Amino acid sequence: IVQLARLSAKCGYMGAVGDDALGKDVLKSLRDENVDTKSMIVKPGKITLHTDIVIDDEGRKFIMLNMGDAFESLTSDELDYSAVSSAKVFYTDLLPKEPAITGLKKARKAGVKTVFNMQVGLGTMQGLHVSKEEILSALKFTDIFAPCRGGLYELTGTTDLDACVRYLRDYCKGTLLFTLGKEGSVAYDEQDRKYTVKSCDLEVVDSTGAGDSYMGSFIYQHCLNCMSIEESMKFATMCAGHTCTGIGARFSPDLKTAETFVWK
């Protein structure tokens, strides 16, 4: 969402935080990035979800997640979904499950393009009370499905991308977008035409946030600017590459930086 906002897209965030210092920091951080937080719910006495990230000398990361108790307590009844029906794109990682699935259904009914970015593996999703069956069921409301590599392989039971697509086509008729780290990214359109883009050849300082940068940049060009899948993948790859050249999840480029770094 922050990457989209930095590229000049008008964005809002729906979710829940506690009224603790972490929650206040989250809200301030989003507002500082020009992300609308009107649909954010503040839960009194609750602890905000947060992470600690350890990075090695090669830029690889290990994430320690503290779920808190604000995030998973969010329900559909607490949210105002009017912003969804007026949006151009609804993006979700399907967490927390019930309000996220409700959002997908409302977006689809309103004709809003939907993007489901499964950011964690199947085991983690199940630990967060989302079953494999519920993930697959959500795909019928999804225009672009972008699972992480581990999640994709666990979900489909294979590491062969063409076989992954054959499996997923029973559930999702939209675009399938697979990010593969150093191996680049691969996409299949609705007609199963395959697009492959290599990763950037650069020195990685910290890969944290690269996937978020990729997705935000892809959505910006493909969903909002109607750029082709392949060209959007190339743009997203360069933005994600830029993110890897600095420390932290927020080293993603703004529009001016993207215009110089990405298109140079």
Where does each model-flagged region fall?
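Active-site glycine-rich loop that binds ribose-phosphate moieties when present
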Residues: 71-80, 98, 127-134
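Gly/Ala-rich phosphate-binding loop of Rossmann-like dinucleotide-binding domains
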Residues: 5-6, 108, 223
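A short acidic, amphipathic alpha-helical/loop segment
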Residues: 98-106, 134-137
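Glycosyltransferases and closely related glycan-assembly transferases
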Residues: 85-86, 101-114
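Conserved phosphate-binding/catalytic region of the ribokinase-like
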Residues: 158-264
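Conserved phosphate/ATP/ADP-binding segment of small-molecule kinases
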Residues: 110, 119-194
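Conserved N-terminal subdomain of the carbohydrate kinase-like
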Residues: 6-88, 259-264
